[in-house]
Amino acid sequence: METQAPIIAFLYDFDKTLCTTDMEDYAFIPSLGYTPAEFWGRANAFGWENRMDGLLAYMYTMIQECAAQNIKLDRAFLNHCGESIQLFPGVREWFARINAFGESLGVQVEHYVISSGLREIIEGSGIAQEFREIYACEFYYNENGDACWPKLDVNFTNKTQFVYRINKGILDVSRDKELNDSMPDDSKRVPFTNMIYMGDGLSDVPCMKMMRVYGGQAIAVYQASNRQGRTGGFHFPGRLPGGHGAGPHRPGHPPENDHHRPAAGGQQPPAPQHRRRCASQSGGAVLNTEYLNDRKTGAENAPVFSVFPGKSLYLQYRFC
């Protein structure tokens, strides 16, 4: 009987991990006539005022704003918005190259998205076919094809559910009973030790912690402009000055001064305290999304996701 090759699973956040900013910022929000700060300000304020999950708040705001402006919010429209996504250099080529590298080592490489963004927008990004499964927020569509209800919400510790699904090979989100049934470790499709998680924001920390606890690997992605990050720090919230900049962002990617959002009852929520945390405390390493050191020359001139000297894979990262 033929023995199946070991499976190595790459698990990715999407926004600011594979692409340069929140996916809604490229085309969806401009189609409403808003700036990203204006839209996220509205969505975040609505969530604060109603003590609402932040992702459900932004999905509700999407439905309401499109209805107010007579924009048909259907799957085709959101797929079209995904065509404007700007991926980091090398991302499109990454999948074929790492797959080939894995094959040369006798392992099967699989890719999964676990994102607080929208599945429908990711489907239009041009790389959706690279993923075995995409776990992201998703709408339910009525008989007219209009988005009318959140079908799936992927947020913070909820993200860990999908790590377990990949671990057990139970990818269908409607199969709750099987997911919670006991399963011997030797029957699990992808061991935690064969998982590599990449993410950049607050919503990724629980999955990073899982990787650390169960023997997988986690890589914290940061921008080159975040000087503190380059020295090994992983910062919350907003990754401090030099990160994403000021103004409201989607929940899970809070900016440095996100404390101006109104809280329930009209009160201002307290200003966040800048908490330093080493990436290794959250389960892994720090990966620069813009430059990697060339091992031979030491020059910082190689874009991320494309540093493959010969047949050796160099995901250049450093532990705290």
Where are these regions (language model features)?
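C-terminal cap/substrate-recognition subdomain and adjoining C-terminal extension
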Residues: Q86-Y112, S116-Y291
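Alpha-helical substrate-recognition element adjacent to the catalytic core
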Residues: E2-E143
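Residue-level recognition of conserved structural "scaffold" positions that shape functional pockets
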Residues: M23, G124, P206, F305, ...
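Hydrophobic alpha-helical membrane context
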Residues: D25-A27, R212, F308, L313
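Generic alpha-helical secondary structure signal
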Residues: M62-Q64, T160, I166-K168, R295, ...
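Positively charged N-terminal leader segments that act as targeting/secretion signals
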Residues: N288-F319
